[in-house]
A protein has these predicted regions:
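Beta-strand/loop edge motif enriched in small/polar residues
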Residues: 1-166
C-alpha cells in the first residue's frame, strides 16, 4: 500500500532531482492491487504488457481492494525507460480496487502515458494530465472504475507527443 496524502496548500510532489528536468527523468508511481483484471494474473506476457515484470503479481477478486491513498499529489517528469522496450507511466494502477483513494492528482510531462489502468475498479476524482508523450489516460485488462473531473491538456507549444495506430 502507498499512502501519500497532501493538502491543497501543501501537495506531495514526486519529481526529478534536477534543475532542468525533462519527461522520463525517473520511473513513475506503480501500484499493484488485488482487484479483478481480465486475462490471467499469473502470466501477463500474453497481454503484450512488456512494461510489467511478471515477478510482481497483481489482480484478484477483491473489488474493494485498498491499495492506499493518493490525495493532493503532483507527479512530474516521470516515465523513464527500463530498457528499449519497457517504458513507465506517470501513474500506473495495476488491478487497484475501489477501496483505494485517488483524488486531486496532477501529472506533468510523463514520457509515456500520464496514467494507465491495468484492470481494477479504482475510482479517480480530479485528475489533470499535462503534456504526456503518449496517452492522457490508457485502459487495458478490463478496467471498470469511474473517473470524475479528469482532464488532459497538451499545450500548444508541446511537440513530444506520439500517436498510437488505433
Amino acid at each position: 500500500k502507498l499512502y501519500a496524502d497532501g493538502t491543497a496548500d501543501k501537495p506531495i510532489v514526486f519529481t526529478a532531482n534536477s534543475t532542468t528536468p525533462t519527461s522520463g527523468y525517473w520511473g513513475g508511481i506503480i501500484i499493484n492491487g488485488k482487484a479483478p483484471i481480465s486475462g490471467s494474473n499469473a502470466n501477463k506476457s500474453d497481454t503484450g504488457l512488456t512494461e510489467i515484470d511478471n515477478n510482481y503479481k497483481y489482480g484478484g477478486n477483491v473489488d474493494n481492494d485498498n491499495s492506499g491513498s493518493l490525495t493532493y499529489v503532483k507527479i512530474c517528469y516521470a516515465g523513464a525507460r527500463s530498457t528499449a522496450d519497457i517504458e513507465h507511466n506517470g501513474l500506473t494502477l495495476n488491478g487497484v480496487g475501489n477501496g483505494t483513494k485517488i483524488e486531486n492528482i496532477y501529472i506533468l510531462e510523463s514520457a509515456d502515458d500520464a496514467v494507465e489502468f491495468f484492470g481494477g475498479t479504482v475510482n479517480v476524482t480530479n485528475l489533470l494530465a499535462v503534456n504526456p508523450d503518449d496517452d492522457m489516460f490508457d485502459f487495458t485488462q478490463g478496467y471498470s472504475g469511474k473517473l470524475k473531473n479528469c482532464y488532459g491538456v497538451w499545450e500548444s507549444d508541446y511537440t513530444s507527443t506520439e500517436a498510437d495506430l488505433r
